[in-house]
């Protein structure tokens, strides 16, 4: 057993002069791999990996997605799907050069926007993502549905989501809405303090009293001072756009794009892994209706509901990890 519980960003050289940033902790020689894909305005950060995960003899890998942080954007004329599957194949092949996509046990997970690349990997053709044959489980936390096929996706959106990533933003030419949002956000400031203020206004200050008390208990149980979580998220937010805003600018096009498959048409082999979807009952960013659509169209799937809004999944993570990895000792 080769345990490495010290996090720190690492860099993998990719073809065409690109770079993939990632962090990894746990048993680096384990053939059980947990690949976690982050959401928007974030990076691959394993510094707060759950001790419960580390006790399960798992190699925990958190890459930074294309166009965010220190990971290069997709090359010109390369689709997001092809870039993602190529990057993740290179990353896993780097750690498991002799596996040829056959002899590891792979769990893939994502939260919020990270559920989109997670689903792309889940349904990807095996010639594009050979490690797809190794997938044992898929975890989608605060999931997005594929807007291309979920015709009612916009009905449960907030006005801000409807404008930025919904029909308004998507159908405006030249990604003008994304450019406008980027302009507004950069005008508000790009320091850690600016990001922390924005996070408080848009996430933490919108908690009701019950969720605020749950959050405070969660911090206390983990020995975190009040404000520490917000500060950490703000630091990663700033890092995520420190090199470019390409990751953000790709969000709306990717949400509306062809992910390479229809959820209701996945073949039997792709549908083999169990899929766990978690949905927060009062989440307005990724409404439960998205989880309902996915559950109705994927096979071998189950939904786990939790109380609270978009942030509330944070408080149930250990419970979710344990349920998702119940077969791992």
Regions found by a protein language model. Name each.
Residues 105-152:
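Conserved hydrolase catalytic core segment
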Residues 53-74:
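Conserved alpha/beta-hydrolase
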Residues 153-264:
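Alpha/beta-hydrolase
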């Amino acid at each position: 057993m080769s345990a490495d519980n010290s996090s720190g960003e690492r860099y993998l050289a990719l073809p065409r002069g690109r770079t993939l940033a990632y962090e990894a902790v746990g048993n680096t020689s384990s053939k059980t791999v947990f690949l976690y894909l982050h959401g928007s305005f974030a990076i691959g950060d394993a510094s707060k990996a759950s001790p419960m995960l580390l006790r399960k003899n798992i190699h925990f890998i958190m890459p930074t997605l294309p166009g965010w942080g220190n990971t290069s954007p997709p090359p010109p004329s390369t689709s997001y799907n092809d870039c993602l599957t190529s990057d993740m194949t290179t990353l896993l092949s780097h750690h498991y050069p002799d596996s040829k996509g056959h002899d590891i046990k792979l769990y893939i997970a994502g939260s919020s926007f990270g559920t989109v690349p997670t689903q792309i990997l889940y349904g990807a053709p095996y010639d594009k993502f050979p490690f797809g044959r190794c997938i044992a489980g898929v975890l989608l936390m605060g999931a997005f549905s594929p807007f291309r096929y979920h015709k009612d996706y916009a009905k449960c959106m907030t006005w801000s989501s409807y404008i930025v990533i919904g029909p308004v933003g998507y159908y405006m030419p030249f990604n003008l809405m994304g450019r406008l949002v980027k302009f507004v956000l950069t005008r508000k400031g790009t320091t850690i303090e600016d990001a922390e203020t924005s996070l408080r206004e848009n996430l933490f200050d919108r908690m009701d009293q019950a969720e605020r008390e749950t959050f405070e208990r969660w911090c206390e149980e983990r020995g975190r001072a009040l404000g520490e979580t917000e500060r950490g998220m703000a630091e990663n937010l700033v890092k995520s756009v420190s090199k470019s805003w390409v990751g953000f600018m790709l969000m709306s096009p990717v949400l509306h794009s062809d992910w390479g498959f229809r959820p209701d048409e996945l073949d039997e082999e792709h549908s083999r892994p169990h899929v766990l979807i978690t949905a927060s009952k009062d989440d307005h960013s990724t409404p439960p209706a998205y989880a309902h659509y996915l559950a109705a169209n994927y096979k071998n799937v189950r939904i786990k509901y939790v109380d609270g809004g978009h942030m509330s999944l944070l408080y149930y993570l250990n419970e979710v990890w344990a349920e998702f990895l119940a077969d791992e000792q």
